[in-house]
């Protein structure tokens, strides 16, 4: 644990924190590097340790100092509606992290966090980006298909398949029916095949990534189903690739009733793209290099409507894709330098408000476990532990175990 070095931050947020003398037993016993309680640790600190920042845990009334956890520890924040999670944890954390230039990816259901902290970060030299799913025209653009297409174009076929599969699972196979998962799985396989078919066509016809987007995936779906498959030239072209054929044949050449069920499921999952041209445009290209998040001070705000859940799958997908892509590039650079494990140059902090409201992120327990050695931290903010159990079931214990800091807030 260390002191935050910017005293103005301490003065701004001190009223929200317990003093050292008022800490509960769990906080007093909590020690990151030594076994002695916080009161004894305080005597050893040099004033304003610089560059060591993290989630705020306590405040000293005597020295007007906020104490933070600057290690690679993850944090779980539990508090019901009205417990001021954003004001007590999220906003102070952003200002503290911003004072040291650490990167952040922040889910922001109400855009309140962005409105209160973006200008501060910009003044501190941050590159600030906004993916605004509430108002797609007012923010940056992000195409989730660009990265896998780049892998495909450079011959990294397995990696391209991996990233496309992540997209299919997060957009199409979310909230699978327990009784009949066949429809979601089949729709996901259909999406996987369409994406690879689009990659194949664009790569072989010299078309760049501007042609690779959700709108053209929907267009391919329509062309493939426009005429019977026996005389469909696009289907004949698709079957020249075994992987694409295997992914699509279960829909294209199946019985009519089964085909109708799969297509109905698929169309329902992608409807938000087909009926919202502004959203489709936002997801058609990239305005920023995702890999730079782990290289230079960057803040990405993921603004999503909190009154409906239809867009939450895109937030889960961004979290998954950004994590995987940054680690891939860090590992690639490490291998070039003869190092075993790739570590991000600039620490990235995922601050995920309403985390348990997001669709399940595939492999998240493994992500949160491996993040520590990659210079990545997670702050997971939920309303109750029960919500987390509902979402991640048997994997909840792994997530909780990897969060050494637990902060409980009450609205009373």
What is the meaning of each model-derived region?
Residues 2-69:
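Pre-P-loop entry segment of helicase/translocase ATPase cores
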Residues 368-370, 374-412:
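Conserved ATP-driven motor cores of ASCE-family P-loop NTPases powering translocation/secretion/packaging/pilus
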Residues 49-376, 391, 401:
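P-loop NTPase motor domains
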